[in-house]
């Protein structure tokens, strides 16, 4: 799921001997999240990392402080790479079934706000595959990269009999 890649990325960097400052925490635990982000912001007042890698939540940022953190890191001149996988909200046919219109409107607005921040502050936005980049072709990111899923590749081909599949993992 959505926790596999961050776990593997973190372990790979640590195993390569890098010092990694980790920010983790759930968006829906507002006070805890804000405290953890403030701790990183304070750390950044005394430290400048070489790079910043971001795995956004599966959904929009609910805490404005996360976008403020991206802005601070960007303004420090630290290159930011962000992995974007949760664009299911762009598929109205599946994403919003049973969701009240008022809630759809608010969440879509928050997703668009996040995309604008990613476009402005991130040096490269990574997607799981080249095919995924087509979903957001209208957003002109500075650079796009491909970062395959953090899983073991299956041996042999995978055959599916379905004509249409929509999978929103996590």
Where do the language-model regions lie?
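Active-site proximal beta-strand in glycosyltransferases
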Residues: 51-52, 71-94, 99-105
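Short beta-strand->alpha-helix junction loop in the catalytic core
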Residues: 131-132, 146-156
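Short N-terminal targeting/anchoring amphipathic segment
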Residues: 42-66, 77-83, 124
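Conserved donor-binding/catalytic core segment of Leloir-type glycosyltransferases
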Residues: 155-170
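Membrane-proximal helix-turn-helix segments that form the acceptor-binding/catalytic region
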Residues: 71, 75, 103-124
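Glycine-rich, highly charged phosphate/nucleotide-binding loops
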Residues: 29-47
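N-terminal subdomain of nucleotide-sugar transferases
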Residues: 1-27, 47
């Amino acid at each position: 799921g959505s926790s596999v890649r961050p776990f593997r990325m973190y372990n790979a960097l640590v195993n390569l001997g890098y010092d990694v400052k980790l920010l983790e925490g759930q968006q829906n635990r507002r006070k805890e999240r804000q405290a953890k982000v403030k701790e990183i912001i304070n750390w950044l007042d005394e430290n400048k990392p070489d790079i910043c890698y971001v795995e956004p939540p599966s959904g929009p940022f609910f805490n404005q402080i996360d976008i403020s953190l991206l802005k601070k890191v960007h303004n420090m001149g630290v290159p930011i790479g962000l992995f974007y996988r949760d664009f299911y909200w762009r598929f109205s046919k599946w994403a919003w079934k049973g969701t009240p219109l008022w809630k759809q409107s608010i969440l879509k607005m928050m997703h668009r706000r996040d995309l604008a921040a990613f476009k402005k502050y991130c040096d490269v936005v990574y997607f799981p595959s080249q095919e995924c980049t087509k979903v957001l072709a209208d957003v002109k990111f500075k650079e796009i990269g491909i970062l395959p899923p953090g899983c073991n590749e299956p041996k042999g081909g995978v055959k599916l009999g379905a004509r249409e599949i929509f999978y929103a993992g996590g």
